[in-house]
Amino acid sequence: MGRRKSQAAAERNLEPIKISTDSIKKRPRRDSNEPPFKKFDDLEMFETYLKGESWDNDFDFLHARLDYYPPFIRNEIHDDPEKIKPTMNNKSKKFVRNLHHHVDKHLLKQINDMVGIEYKFKREEEKLPDGRLIWRYKDESDHGFEGLDRKWTVEVDVECSPNDPTVVVDMRSIPID
């Protein structure tokens, strides 16, 4: 991370964390089988939430949804939704290529950094009849915490539509009994 990026991350309190077996406690008692649902429209708030859940020891029991314009779109339109072009959607190969780069090189890496666990996501692609494109990233590994009763799966769905450049990221972390 460059000096300006690390300085900006420190100001936002988004420094990456690393979870070790020493920091993992016994699974907390929960009143529901479904994790609480949180919805965000800002990438930084989403990252802050993930970091907070890790600090609260709830990294294995969360459901968060992020609806946002990816950074490459925001940079092109200069944060002015009026400048969105009709070609800024998943019908454009350039949009899909840039989104794929953003997700693989930035979003999933930030999720790993904020949660403090190295997820090894495997991707499946699905194109729906209505034109929506969904990439399903899934991780079912045990993350090296043998001996602890904390096993979970993580699913991250990234969805984009043929109508606009909005990207929907749906992250679910579900404990396995």
From Swiss-Prot:
Broad class of the protein's primary localization: membrane
Stated family: Belongs to the RGI1 family.
GO annotation, cellular component aspect: plasma membrane
Taxonomic superkingdom: Eukaryota
Purpose of the protein: Involved in the control of energetic metabolism and significantly contribute to cell fitness, especially under respiratory growth conditions.
Chain residue ranges for the region called Disordered: 1-37
Membrane topology field: Peripheral membrane protein
GO biological process, one term: energy reserve metabolic process
Pfam families on file: RGI1 (PF10843)
Keyword Membrane included in the entry's annotation: yes
Record's keyword terms, sorted: Cell membrane, Membrane
Name of this chain's protein: Respiratory growth induced protein 1
Record localization: Cell membrane
Organism expressing this protein natively: Komagataella phaffii (strain GS115 / ATCC 20864) (Yeast)
InterPro entries named in the record: RGI1, RGI1_sf
